[in-house]
Amino acid sequence: MPIVRAKPTSPGRRFVEKVVHPHLYKGRPFAALLESKSKTGGRNNNGRITTRHIGGGHKQHYRIIDFKRTKDNIPATVERIEYDPNRTAHIALLKYADGERRYIIAAKKQAVGDTVMSGELSPIRPGNCLPLKNIPLGTVIHNIELKIGKGAQMARAAGASVQLLGRDGIYAILRLRSGETRRVHVNCRAVIGEVSNTENNLKSLGKAGASRWRGIRPSVRGVAMNPVDHPHGGGEGRNKGRHPTSPWGQKSKGLKTRHNKRTDNMIIRRRAKKK
């Protein structure tokens, strides 16, 4: 899709770069697959901030996405490709042969009128969902289950993909974009192809207000705070006086924070460290 740079008619327009998607449906979403979505402002039930930098933003409805893809051997037609404010990927509205409609994450190059299927005997085509044991080696996949029947958890964002490298007994070996190589059970399902909206990372919001529309509040540097607010706060000038840390004193550069030993044996090779 073309990337359009806005004319600098105002300071807020000067740096705007957006990806144009003429194929997206212009009307309202399918009402039966919508749910209300209430904003928390990053607060918990006590009214205390549990996640910083959240607040405001445009009202949104949640689109109910079919991440399990368990409607097997029934062909579905892509009725339309839609924008979804809850994720970076686009979504596709499917109409099954029995009349049921469901939303799925749209695959790259998926178009209106395409036929989509789920199940072990589905053809290897973008958007089709199969168990990992039925997918040819070397295939690029997305929307991957980590537990059988739980629904897709991995590679769901715009442009995301994983490559199926091989199979070892009851496990499939996958290479992630991060460089990590890991095992997943061969009965877990995955969808063929890459996730749609691959150029999402090339856009530029252009102004602070565009982040506020998305419900993202400003991030204040620790060195600009007082000592009571952050370990980097206070002092004359801009010295931290210590290694970079979070507001709660945890080291924020290079410290390992993974504590899930239960799945350590599923990771064959760790992702590469940043240089």
Swiss-Prot record:
Protein name (Swiss-Prot/TrEMBL): Large ribosomal subunit protein uL2
GO BP terms: cytoplasmic translation
One Gene Ontology MF term: transferase activity
NCBIfam families recorded: rplB_bact
Gene3D superfamilies attached to this UniProt entry: 2.30.30.30, Nucleic acid-binding proteins, Ribosomal protein L2, domain 3
Keywords: Ribonucleoprotein, Ribosomal protein, RNA-binding, rRNA-binding
SMART domains: Ribosomal_L2, Ribosomal_L2_C
GO-annotated cellular components: large ribosomal subunit
Classification via Pfam families: Ribosomal_L2 (PF00181), Ribosomal_L2_C (PF03947)
Family: Belongs to the universal ribosomal protein uL2 family.
UniProt keyword annotation of Membrane present: no
Gene name per UniProt: rplB
